[in-house]
Amino acid sequence: METVRIIYVRDNQTLKTVFVDRDGTINRDCPYCHELDDLQIYDDTVGILKHYQGKGYRIIIVTNQSGIGRGYFSMEEFRRFNDGVVNRLLDLGVKVSATYFCPHRPDEGCSCRKPGIGLINEALSDFRVDIGGSLVIGDRDDVDGQLARNLGLPFRIVSH
């Protein structure tokens, strides 16, 4: 199983980018989120993302999804839930360009699982990113914050 990407909007611009965690940051973190009935978007995160989007930042979701590797839900169930998140954000005025996710279990030792930088490297191969002007937003300093530190980027923690 490889790092997986879902690209919603392609562009050729070099843009500052917000790399944002999904579960616990954009939406309520439920155990291995994959049911649309469980989807609850955090208004404060929407406001933060709209702020950066208004300043010309691209929005890209980066998320660990070990529930796939553990067999708790399928790739199709993940995609359906993630599309629900992205569509809800779009309804609220936030355009997500792509989602990059690691489907592996933590014990698999892959290079894409956050706080490793594999997901970001994939995004950098698909998009022109002003990495020096970019940042990471997430709810966990040990994962999202460490990802930011590994990249030398600022980190904005959100808590709900």
UniProtKB/Swiss-Prot annotation:
Which SUPFAM superfamilies does UniProt cross-reference here? HAD-like
The site annotation (Contributes to substrate recognition) covers: 113
Report the Gene3D superfamilies cross-referenced here: HAD superfamily/HAD-like
Could you tell me the EC number(s) of this protein?
3.1.3.-
According to the UniProt record, one GO cellular component term is:
cytoplasm
- Please list the GO terms describing molecular function: D-glycero-beta-D-manno-heptose 1,7-bisphosphate 7-phosphatase activity; magnesium ion binding; zinc ion binding
**Entry keyword Cytoplasm:** yes
Per its record, the protein catalyses: D-glycero-D-manno-heptose 1,7-bisphosphate + H2O = D-glycero-D-manno-heptose 1-phosphate + phosphate
Enumerate the UniProt keywords alphabetically: Carbohydrate metabolism, Cytoplasm, Hydrolase, Magnesium, Metal-binding, Zinc
Q: What are its cofactors? A: Mg(2+); Zn(2+)
Domain of life per record: Archaea
Q: Where in the cell is it found?
A: Cytoplasm
Which residues does the record give as Mg(2+) binding sites?
21, 23, 139
Active-site residues? Answer: 21, 23
Which Pfam family name is an example for this entry? PNK3P
Positions bound to Zn(2+) = 102, 104, 110, 112
Could you tell me the Gene Ontology terms of the biological process aspect for this record? carbohydrate metabolic process
Which InterPro entries does UniProt cross-reference here?
HAD-like_sf, HAD-SF_hydro_IIIA, HAD_sf, Heptose_bisP_phosphatase, Histidinol-phos, PNK3P
Question: Site annotated as Stabilizes the phosphoryl group: where?
Answer: 63, 114
Q: What does the entry list as the binding residues for substrate?
A: 21-23, 29-32, 63-66, 113-114
Subunit info? Monomer.
Checking PANTHER family in the record gives: D-GLYCERO-BETA-D-MANNO-HEPTOSE-1,7-BISPHOSPHATE 7-PHOSPHATASE (PTHR42891:SF1)
Q: Which protein family is it in?
A: Belongs to the GmhB family.
Name of the protein in question = Probable D-glycero-D-manno-heptose-1,7-bisphosphate 7-phosphatase
Its source organism is: Thermoplasma acidophilum (strain ATCC 25905 / DSM 1728 / JCM 9062 / NBRC 15155 / AMRC-C165)
Which gene produces this protein? Answer: gmhB
